[in-house]
Amino acid sequence: MLTRRTFAVALIAALAVPTLAAAQATTPSAATIERQLEAAPRVKLRPNQRVTIREFKRRPDLRRMARSIDIQSINFAFGSAAISESQYGKIENIADALQRILRRDPGARVLIEGHTDAVGSFRSNQILSEQRAASLKRTLVREFGVPGYALETVGYGEEFLLVQTQNENWRNRRVTLRRFDDFIR
């Protein structure tokens, strides 16, 4: 039999679930993605300060200076890098933004960073994050016609958690799009 207290707790929990689901499902619009990646560069490197793509991927200090946006709404099955067609509507926003940017600036380059939460081994999370970033690139190129030359991928596993926890947290399972053409030789 439900007491008032039990009912109140159950009601609060039930009301919180749709909010959490809505937060997870929120996808930035193409205009928002475009605006973030087209914002004025935070820093302008001199030509002799520019680095290789490989070095850029290894330098958190440079990546933090690059224009970026976190995408937390692409849902992957647990332990999987496959992107189902049900996610294509979300990915279409990314594709539209990238295509508009590339029409204006064919030299634009975007790094797709894969991130995981801390559940599982460090190695398996590293591999999974790399596979998810590659899967998103493949989908953008094959399904939406984004030129592959404009995209690079990297996985960081659980290295850059947004929420510092060893437990499962959806905010840590994300893709970050980072504009890097201002940083490379």
Show where each model-derived region lies:
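Periplasmic OmpA-like peptidoglycan-binding domain that tethers envelope proteins to the cell wall
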Residues: 115-185
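A generic secondary-structure boundary signal that marks alpha-helix termini
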Residues: 16-19, 100-103, 145
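N-terminal targeting leaders that direct proteins to extracytoplasmic destinations
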Residues: 2-67
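Periplasmic peptidoglycan-binding/anchoring modules of Gram-negative envelope and division proteins
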Residues: 80-113, 141-142, 177, 185
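Extracytoplasmic
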Residues: 66-71, 86, 93, 105-107, ...
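Short, solvent-exposed beta-strand/turn patches at coil↔beta or beta↔helix junctions
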Residues: 46-50, 54-58, 62-97, 117-123
